[in-house]
């Protein structure tokens, strides 16, 4: 039983408000810096109240960073990775839960263990595969002594190279597996009696039931893929056509090597531009996101 007293309520609200202020303070500083001119931003201390140059700085940041192109690239990559993760996670969890075969739990735990292997750890072999996606198959053919030369498939500087290496997800597989385990067995038996095969059961029964779970996973993965920096920086050398929004931020803050001081007001405006899409997605899917994580009704 949870006690409700005026003192505990006051302490709880004080803790929550303090945490909210600590979370919002960096965002407020970014917003304030993006609304001032160059001279005001470089004052010590910098004013903590917004100025009247926000639209000017946003326009300059958009033009300087070529955001009309890179925002589209980031959107393509984020949507592609999100859809790929949802499809791969749902299919793998469906196989593990609804099909009985040897080593299925071993396969699940092998997938789950990859949570301890972030992209930074496997960056070198992943890049090697992206440089020639058919090289592992060619090596297998060579070991088996099959005289077949596969063509080179280079994924660098392509949307495929930005998306495909990121679509595997242990988190999504785990979430879908836990959801599928809560689906009543009677529903599966009823689908079998109605003549539904595995694919039809998956598409017409499980997928509609997992809408909230899908929305929660989509929110997490969209924000994660939108904020990717290391992998696009490594796999993209054609910055004019395939650079993403997070990569473009480095060009907004020129250093001494560029012959001019950092323009922090424009850089902060660029951060607001890059921050807007994931914030908008999170706000729009917030209710579905919470329901997908805590809802147990089917």
Which residues does each predicted region cover?
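A structural signal for multi-pass alpha-helical bundles of membrane permease subunits
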Residues: 2, 8-298
